[in-house]
Amino acid sequence: TKLFKKETIENLFEHYLYMLTDIIENVDAKIKDIDIITPKENKLLEKFNATDGEINNDTTAYLIEKQVDENPNNIAVICEDKVLTYKQLDDKANSLANYLIKIGVKSNDIVCIMTNRSLETIVAMYAVLKAGGAFLNVDPTYPVDRTKYYIESSRSQYVLTQKELKDRVKEIPNCIEIDLDNNIYQENKDRPKVNIKMEDLSYIIYTSGSTGVPKGV
């Protein structure tokens, strides 16, 4: 009793009795098949694991838009001393999404986002989803060769970036560079009418790769 609480001893004894009963009733059972968990505990485990629920088939863009409609003036994004309300975020994303559609971005097209940590990163991700595309975030501190590999292997033709990073993007061939600091937010702020399906691609991330070569998934 100095080592264990009374409840612990009672539980151990209950398990021991249950195991002995199981052995007596199943004399040919293998050790690995002997159960020490009581029926009462099994029911408790089943209750804990009862996590079945309805699957929400709404897209990410739709769920954010729903939040915009319900709480337009609530703060959606904070980065350092800058903030965007849900309405401001939606307006900027709509404008950028309409611009992307205008220049040719279609469903499942990969759009690379190479930005410093900023509000524009979130706006760009949201806008790409609204346009029906899939985003690929690339750290601007990566070496040019690595960035080039990501963009080429993902077959991305568009790069959303910022003024201070434009020179890095220019080193990558066959890419349409879009400056987020430009006046692209002056486009139509209406929500794009794009038929986005649940099975459409949403984003790509690159793993380190078991062979040492990053893989996009």
Language model regions located:
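Carrier-protein-dependent adenylate-forming modules in NRPS/ANL systems
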Residues: 1-33, 51-217
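Short, highly charged C-terminal tails/helix-capping segments
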Residues: 32-44
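Short, contiguous pre-domain boundary segments
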Residues: 46-49
